[in-house]
Amino acid sequence: MKREKIALAYSGGLDTSVMIKWLKDKYDADIIAVTGNLGQEKEIENLEQKAFDTGASGFSFLDLRKEFVENYIWPALKAGALYEEVYPLATALGRPLLAKALVDVALSEDCTMIAHGCTGKGNDQVRFEVTFASLAPHLKVLAPLREWEFNSREAEMAYAEKHGIPVSATKKSPYSIDENIWGISIECGVLEDPMVAPPEDAYQITTSPEKAPDNAAVIDIEFEQGVPVALDGRKMEGLDLIVELNKHGAAHGVGRLDMIENRVVGIKSREIYEAPAATILHFAHRELERLTLEKTVFQYKNTISQDYANLIYNGTWFSPMREALDGFVDATQKHVTGLVRVKLFKGSVTLLGRTSPWSLYNEELATYTEADTFNHKAAEGFIHLYGLGLKTYSEVQANNRK
């Protein structure tokens, strides 16, 4: 009888290394380990050999960076998606792509089951499993961390030693860290107390603002229809542009975020994020929208931005709602083209200037100099009509009080 196959989202860490052996024994199945590169800086070399040494029957490494930027990050940037107005959704954006890649491998390898290493307390289990349900509802989903017998890292280490599973014996960081090109999330340890300032060792890439250079960096960012395309006059691919902005921002202490956020599972959590490029680009993009979007579109888009952010955070990327919102967002971005000049200095991003061929700012109408072309006499009639409803309301109230 043909053995069943399980596609496992594999990072090479302790949890997923132990999972290969555990799943293989529990389900008498072959394990296909799947790793996706979203631009994380942590060690991803030698994962194939490690997976095979741990007992995997197959291994798939997928470079997803370009797809991540073009099909996930840019749509979220155009939408202005910041969860609860702060978090640029780095981890949340990466999950549907990783889940999709896992499904693709599972289908190509004729797997009957699919497994992930998410805990039963976090958001990621929702994001992975909702994506699985959307793309391959026939696959059985396995979540070992919700059901296996290990209740501590030490128990997992003992299991690994017993079965000859190669895992790192170094001291575990007190923090839980997830990283991709759009940002880094940091939690646990002393960070669980919301009154404790994050220690410097919690931050992975950004310089402390106090230790950042005393000279500011000035950067010109060009956009075409809401998408960043150039830095300082140099046309760049999206991936390269984000990498360069991350370096500039991190060096100047930009992109440190500290928030209490509402998780999908109903609890509040304290999260620390580092997102230099995301912070800079969201800021610059919004300022260009202020210049180019008509008033009612600009104001209504705030609602759409929050809806889009919630959709990403809650794990429903592959949904009719996201496709519908993309239609609205794309329509708003047709004229979000131009240049934004920003200054990076000791943790802050400051606007220095912006210009666009689609600018709705008319200096002759806005000026208070002799060049003013605004018809001041028209204001009297406008104010009369604009306030007519309130005037009528007040008159009726006054008459009825007599």
UniProtKB/Swiss-Prot annotation:
Catalytic activity line of the entry: L-citrulline + L-aspartate + ATP = 2-(N(omega)-L-arginino)succinate + AMP + diphosphate + H(+)
Cross-referenced Pfam families: Arginosuc_syn_C, Arginosuc_synth
One annotated Gene Ontology cellular component of this protein: cytoplasm
Known pathway: Amino-acid biosynthesis; L-arginine biosynthesis; L-arginine from L-ornithine and carbamoyl phosphate: step 2/3
EC number: 6.3.4.5
Main location: cytoplasm
Location(s), subcellular: Cytoplasm
BP GO terms, sorted: argininosuccinate metabolic process; L-arginine biosynthetic process; urea cycle
Keywords on record: Amino-acid biosynthesis, Arginine biosynthesis, ATP-binding, Cytoplasm, Ligase, Nucleotide-binding
InterPro entries recorded: Arginosuc_syn_C, Arginosuc_syn_N, Arginosuc_synth, Arginosuc_synth_CS, Arginosuc_synth_type_1_subfam, AS_cat/multimer_dom_body, Rossmann-like_a/b/a_fold
Family per similarity comment: Belongs to the argininosuccinate synthase family. Type 1 subfamily.
Subunit-structure text: Homotetramer.
Entry protein name: Argininosuccinate synthase
Organism for this UniProt entry: Chlorobium phaeobacteroides (strain BS1)
Upper classification of the organism: Bacteria, Pseudomonadati, Chlorobiota, Chlorobiia, Chlorobiales
Originating gene: argG
